[in-house]
Amino acid sequence: MRQNVLFEFGTPIVRVLNALDALSNGRGILVVDDENRENEGDMIFAAENMTVKQMALAIRYGSGIVCLCLTEEKCRQLKLPMMVKNNSNHYKTAFTVTIEASKGITTGVSAKDRLTTIKTSIEDYAKPSDLNRPGHVFPLRAHNGGVLSRSGHTEAAVDLTTLAGLKPFGVICEVTNEDGSMARTTEIIKFSKQYDMPVLTISDVIAYRMSNL
């Protein structure tokens, strides 16, 4: 059903290629997961080239929970422990403790401050002391193996930024409707046309990666 709705965006492989082009050129993308999973759409931006304007868009039209998708290696580098010892989340979403840049911000909640925290985190030689805990940015630890090991938005963000030739870190936020409900595929498509963001599915990313093994 969803594949028929997304046909206007091309085949699964074309949708991925369009997303990679968008990310490499500093645009956001929209990724929807399985209809039998969360059935939600996330805005995804490459952390490396995300702008304050894009962060403001994510905060305004998203859930407000802005997440930074990191590799396991980066989480170790920053010494970010998991938020809880025993993860009972149904989808095993791997939240670490929340973070804030230790310098260059005020309250940490503005679009500019959140982006400063993200840019600080993804610096090649970032240190644990560069971040305060807790904060207003929610890091997520991606599984090694990406979407081939876990079909989540976290892994899709890391896979897509990597495939786009960028640092393997993505910023994600769920898209919501004006009434606060979660946007589904129809609303996601409308949003994509309004903000010029290509749409694809996590299944598309899996298919693309499988075709390149």
Swiss-Prot record:
Residue sites binding D-ribulose 5-phosphate per the record: R37, E38, D42, R150, S151, G152, H153, T154, E174
Top-level taxon: Bacteria
UniProt entry keywords in alphabetical sequence: Lyase, Magnesium, Manganese, Metal-binding, Riboflavin biosynthesis
Cofactors named for this entry: Mg(2+); Mn(2+)
GO cellular component: cytosol
Gene Ontology molecular function: any one: 3,4-dihydroxy-2-butanone-4-phosphate synthase activity
Cofactor binding annotation: Binds 2 divalent metal cations per subunit. Magnesium or manganese.
Pathway annotation: Cofactor biosynthesis; riboflavin biosynthesis; 2-hydroxy-3-oxobutyl phosphate from D-ribulose 5-phosphate: step 1/1
Reactions the enzyme catalyzes: D-ribulose 5-phosphate = (2S)-2-hydroxy-3-oxobutyl phosphate + formate + H(+)
Binding site for Mg(2+) 2: E38, H153
Protein purpose: Catalyzes the conversion of D-ribulose 5-phosphate to formate and 3,4-dihydroxy-2-butanone 4-phosphate.
Family: Belongs to the DHBP synthase family.
Subunit structure: Homodimer.
Protein name as annotated: 3,4-dihydroxy-2-butanone 4-phosphate synthase
Source organism (scientific name): Blochmanniella floridana
Name of the gene this protein is made from: ribB
